[in-house]
């Protein structure tokens, strides 16, 4: 059993490090992890789940607004992307946050094609991050269920 725990912990550390090295996460995610303790072991997963729900709503709102060809409310899209950038920043979603900056610039210049293209990239990046973080949280659960502790990962 100890070998299984050690293998899971190693996979967890390697996977976590890869998320930082590939630019999916930044130091804010590390800060968020520091707020998690024995009293609130699911804190990060809960915060990230709320982030995912926010992302889906905001991306959907922006897609609907951009669907109004010839009558796009760029202020609405800009407001939604600003919220998404803030949410992304608060959980350490580095790539999503970076794309939000570009999308905001497209909104500010009322570049319709740029907005559509950037929003598609945001959606892809969000879905990729969601899958990766769900894998990370699943690894955490496997470690705990095997009787192990989640290792501290130094980036």
Swiss-Prot record:
UniProt keyword annotation of Cytoplasm present: yes
Pfam families on file: Hpt
Keywords, in A-Z order: Acetylation, Cytokinin signaling pathway, Cytoplasm, Nucleus, Phosphoprotein, Stress response, Two-component regulatory system
Sites of Phosphohistidine modification: 82
Assigned GO CC terms: cytoplasm; cytosol; nucleus; plastid
Top-level taxon of the source organism: Eukaryota
Any one GO BP annotation for this protein: embryo sac egg cell differentiation
Description of what induces expression: By salt, cold and drought stress.
Distribution of this protein across tissues and organs: Strongly expressed in roots. Detected also in flowers, leaves, siliques and stems.
Post-translational modification: Two-component system major event consists of a His-to-Asp phosphorelay between a sensor histidine kinase (HK) and a response regulator (RR). In plants, the His-to-Asp phosphorelay involves an additional intermediate named Histidine-containing phosphotransfer protein (HPt). This multistep phosphorelay consists of a His-Asp-His-Asp sequential transfer of a phosphate group between first a His and an Asp of the HK protein, followed by the transfer to a conserved His of the HPt protein and finally the transfer to an Asp in the receiver domain of the RR protein.
N-acetylmethionine: residues carrying this PTM: 1
Location in the cell: Cytoplasm, Cytosol; Nucleus
Cited SUPFAM superfamilies: Histidine-containing phosphotransfer domain, HPT domain
Signal peptide: none
Domain HPt: 40-147
Gene3D superfamilies: HPT domain
GO function terms (MF aspect): histidine phosphotransfer kinase activity; protein histidine kinase binding
CDD domains documented for this protein: HPT (cd00088)
Biological role: Functions as a two-component phosphorelay mediators between cytokinin sensor histidine kinases and response regulator (B-type ARRs). Plays an important role in propagating cytokinin signal transduction through the multistep His-to-Asp phosphorelay.
Complex and partners: Interacts with the B-type response regulators ARR1, ARR2 and ARR9. Binds to ETR1, AHK2, AHK3, AHK4, AHK5 and CKI1.
PANTHER family tied to this protein: HISTIDINE-CONTAINING PHOSPHOTRANSFER PROTEIN 3 (PTHR28242:SF65), PHOSPHORELAY INTERMEDIATE PROTEIN YPD1 (PTHR28242)
Notes on the domains: Histidine-containing phosphotransfer domain (HPt) contains an active histidine that mediates the phosphotransfer.
Protein name: Histidine-containing phosphotransfer protein 3
Organism of origin: Arabidopsis thaliana (Mouse-ear cress)
Name of the gene this protein is made from: AHP3
């Amino acid at each position: 059993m100890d070998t299984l725990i050690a293998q899971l912990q190693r996979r967890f550390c390697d996977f976590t490090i890869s998320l930082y090295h590939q630019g999916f996460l930044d130091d804010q995610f590390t800060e968020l992890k520091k707020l998690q303790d024995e009293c609130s072991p699911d804190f990060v997963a809960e915060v990230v789940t709320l982030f995912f729900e926010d992302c889906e709503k905001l991306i959907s709102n922006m897609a609907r607004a951009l669907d109004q060809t010839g009558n796009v409310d760029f202020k609405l899209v800009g407001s939604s992307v600003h919220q998404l950038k803030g949410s992304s920043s608060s959980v350490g979603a580095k790539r999503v946050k970076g794309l939000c900056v570009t999308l905001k610039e497209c909104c500010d210049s009322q570049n319709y094609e740029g907005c559509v293209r950037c929003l598609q990239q945001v959606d892809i990046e969000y879905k990729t991050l969601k899958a990766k973080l769900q894998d990370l949280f699943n690894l955490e659960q496997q470690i705990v269920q095997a009787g192990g502790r989640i290792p501290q990962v130094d980036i």
